[in-house]
């Protein structure tokens, strides 16, 4: 196809197109982050009522990632297409609803911008390759999972498990690791945090993390192979400890306040996939091993 040939031979055009795509995807991720937990809660309630033998709730209006159309949470004004252009509409509207002038949350444009910038970097890092396409899907998934976990302390299986399988499929073709390394990465990724979970619970009687974290690290191992696991665990622990203390201080929260670990795993895994080899070599040279 002429367009694909053009993008393959013009790296800058590929990066710019990927940034624009990232803006659109970022807008959709805002919808996913807002609606998916509510959709899951609806399903849980329906399943609980069925298990308890209760009458099902009256049929509710359709609620999914497509319907109903997005609306202002304050006045209910339905957002029109020209009011939903990523970043542009937010700036044109001055960050306010066109109807009631209520402030629009700053996180919406920030998510769009972050998705665009990360997507552009992936395109620049990998070039016009299958690796770039796969890494874009992973990046978008990690962003959505991180935000949902930060809001609800929840890592949805509907996001984690498909990405785990996608990582194994990608590495069937050797995009990031061999298939054997990816399989071991998935197994060891799950078992490593599972072991820490039970050891911590035996010692303290408390649950230090959720099962979603096990699955997330297994998913990252399926993408990068078992070799990225030590660096991912180390980076996520360091970043989580530092930011966790800062967040507790800022919120004046108690030390027992739960802190989602998923975002730190996602950040660390993403870094390990892109720069793991360079970070490891630099550390070994600094430590005098090479």
From Swiss-Prot:
Gene3D superfamilies: 1.20.120.1220. Zn(2+) binds at residues 72, 75, 97, 100. One of its GO terms (molecular function) is N-methyltransferase activity. GO terms for cellular component: plasma membrane; type II protein secretion system complex. It catalyses: Typically cleaves a -Gly-|-Phe- bond to release an N-terminal, basic peptide of 5-8 residues from type IV prepilin, and then N-methylates the new N-terminal amino group, the methyl donor being S-adenosyl-L-methionine. Its cofactor is Zn(2+). Zinc is required for the N-terminal methylation of the mature pilin, but not for signal peptide cleavage. It comes from the Bacteria. Plays an essential role in type IV pili and type II pseudopili formation by proteolytically removing the leader sequence from substrate proteins and subsequently monomethylating the alpha-amino group of the newly exposed N-terminal phenylalanine. Substrates include proteins required for pilus biogenesis PilE, PilV, PilW, and PilX as well as some components of the type II general secretory apparatus GspG, GspH, GspI and GspJ. This is Prepilin leader peptidase/N-methyltransferase. It comes from Pseudomonas aeruginosa (strain ATCC 15692 / DSM 22644 / CIP 104116 / JCM 14847 / LMG 12228 / 1C / PRS 101 / PAO1). The gene is pilD.
């Amino acid at each position: 196809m002429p367009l694909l040939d053009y993008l393959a031979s013009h790296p800058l055009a590929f990066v710019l197109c990927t940034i624009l795509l990232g803006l659109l995807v970022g807008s959709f991720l805002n919808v996913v982050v807002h609606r998916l937990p509510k959709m899951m809660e609806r399903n849980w309630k329906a399943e609980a009522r069925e298990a308890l033998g209760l009458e099902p709730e009256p049929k509710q209006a359709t609620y999914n990632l497509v319907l109903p159309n997005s609306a202002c949470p304050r006045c209910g004004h339905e957002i029109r297409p020209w009011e939903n252009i990523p970043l542009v509409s937010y700036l044109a509207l001055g960050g306010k609803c066109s109807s009631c002038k209520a402030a629009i949350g700053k996180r919406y444009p920030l998510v769009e911008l972050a998705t665009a910038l990360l997507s552009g970097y992936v395109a620049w890092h990998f070039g016009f390759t299958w690796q770039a396409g796969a890494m874009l899907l992973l990046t978008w998934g990690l962003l959505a999972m991180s935000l949902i976990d930060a809001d609800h302390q929840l890592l949805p299986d509907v996001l984690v498990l498909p990405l785990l399988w996608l990582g194994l499929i990608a590495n069937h073709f050797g995009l990031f690791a061999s298939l054997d390394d990816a399989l071991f990465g998935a197994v060891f990724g799950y078992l490593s945090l599972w072991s820490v979970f039970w050891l911590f619970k035996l010692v303290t009687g408390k649950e230090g993390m959720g099962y979603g974290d096990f699955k997330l690290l297994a998913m990252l191992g399926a993408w990068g192979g078992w070799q990225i696991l030590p660096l991912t665990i180390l980076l996520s622990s360091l970043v989580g400890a530092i930011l966790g203390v800062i967040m507790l201080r800022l919120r004046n929260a108690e030390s027992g306040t739960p802190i989602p670990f998923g975002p730190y795993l996602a950040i660390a895994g993403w870094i390990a996939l892109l720069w793991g080899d360079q970070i490891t070599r630099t550390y070994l040279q600094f430590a005098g091993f090479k």
